[in-house]
Each structure stands twice: as C-alpha cells, then as structure tokens.
Amino acid sequence: MKAILRSFAAACAVILTLAAASSSNADEFSSSQRSEVERIVREYLIAHPEVLQEAMNELDKRQTAAQAEKHKTAIKQYSDALFSSPRQVVLGNPNGNVTFVEFFDYNCGYCKRAMDDMLTLLKDDPKLKVVLKEFPVLGPGSVEAAQVAVAVHMQDKTGKKYLEFHQKLLTGRGEANKARALAVAKDIGLDMARLDKDMASPEVKATLQESFKLAEALGLNGTPSYVIGDNVVVGAVGLEALKEKVNTSRCGKPSC
C-alpha cells in the first residue's frame, strides 16, 4: 500500500510539473487551481490505475538506460586498469577479442556457484580473455584470503597455479581465511617462504586497492560482478546470460 501511495504521489508531482512547465503563467497557479489539477489527476488514476504501473515501468527503463551509460563512461575511463593492469590475473587468451572481467570474493556463495560458468567459457571460447579481480567485501576472512591469492599470483604469473589455488579455495568447505588459503597454497606446491615475503609487500595492498577503486567507479558493491566489453553484469546470472553478453560484445548480438 505504501508503495502504491508513493507511486501515486510521484505521478501527481510529475503531472503537476508538466502542467506548470507548459503554462506561460506557471508561477501564477493559485492554490485552488492546483487543488483542481490534483482532483483531476486523482480521479483519472482511480479510473485508470494501470497508468501507475506503466509509469513505473517507464521509469525503470530510463533508470536502467542511464545506469548503462554511466557504466560505459566508467569502463572507458578506467579501461587500462580494468583490462590491462599488470597486477591482474589473466586466464585464457591474453590477446582475445573479448575481455571478461570478474570481481569475486572467496566467501561468496554465488561466486562458488558461478565459477563453473567462468571455467566453461574459458574452455569453450579460445578467443576469450578472462581477468579475475580480488574484491573481498565479506569480512576479514575474505581480505586475508585475497591477500594470499595476490601473493600466489606474484609467484606464478602464468596463471596456472593461481587457477588451481582459486578453484580449491573457492570450492572448499568453511570460511575462506588466511589459514585455509595458506593450506591450499602449500597443498599445490608453492614456495611458502616466498609467499610469506610477498604477502608483506606493498604490491598486495596496491592490488586490492586498485580493485576497490574500480568497483567504486562502476558502482559495484557485491559479488560476483562482471565487466564484459562495455557492459556491467551484476550477480550470478548463469552461463547462457554470460555467453550472450560475450557474443554481444564480440559481434553485436546475443548469438554469433
């Protein structure tokens, strides 16, 4: 009911504004004239309540379009850091004609479910460049796990060991934190002395700060979130939806 009343009030305000804007004597509306307009609006909306839904649908469309434009502007402004940062993890084809960027958190349940989508795209699309951005937003354990992950990447720039680490930690049971991340790193045969040294380096902090800066510029506050071409996709939308975005970026339509 409150939502309907808010919609009704918004509709009245919009119509009054339009009426005022179209009148050469807009500033001369008397209180009685405004009351009459409000009465007419109220009676019309009661007789045609579907107008409220139409108005809200149109508002949603405009807001979605405006948000998409903001995303495109931000992606263009930060394209180097998004797609070509020397700090980022790159999987797949480094010279691919479409870049697929994922922001994730090791304690994100939706990220765990979405990992197979990313791996399938990686396996099936030889022209896809995949970039992984650590975005630990779910507490101290997530930050610790991300710090270890950055150090893992510093030790293995090929991405092979990082991907092994990524899969094991993301699919493991319990909270991802420093202890679990270090256990995974040891299990896959990394140099633990070097890992400890790298974790203390300024590069780890700078890498995470870069991810948070990009996320802020794009208006991202949850995981998983994706940048595919000049589009932002929020949430675990599923393999087919991600494929469509990749295809749209590559050839201008959902299927190539």
Feature locations, PLM:
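Extracytoplasmic/secreted proteins, especially bacterial periplasmic and envelope-associated proteins
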Residues: 36, 40, 47-54, 113, ...
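C-terminal cap of thioredoxin/glutaredoxin-like
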Residues: 4-8, 26-42, 62, 183-256
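Solvent-exposed coil/turn segments that connect beta secondary-structure elements
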Residues: 105-106, 135-136, 231, 238
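Short pre-active-site segment immediately N-terminal to redox-active cysteine/selenocysteine motifs
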Residues: 104-107, 222
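A short beta-strand-turn-helix
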Residues: 80-98
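Structural alpha/beta surface segment adjacent to cysteine/selenocysteine redox centers
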Residues: 101, 112-186, 196, 216-221, ...
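The canonical Cys-X-X-Cys-His
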Residues: 108-112, 225-227
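N-terminal targeting signals for export/organelle localization
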Residues: 2-4, 13-80
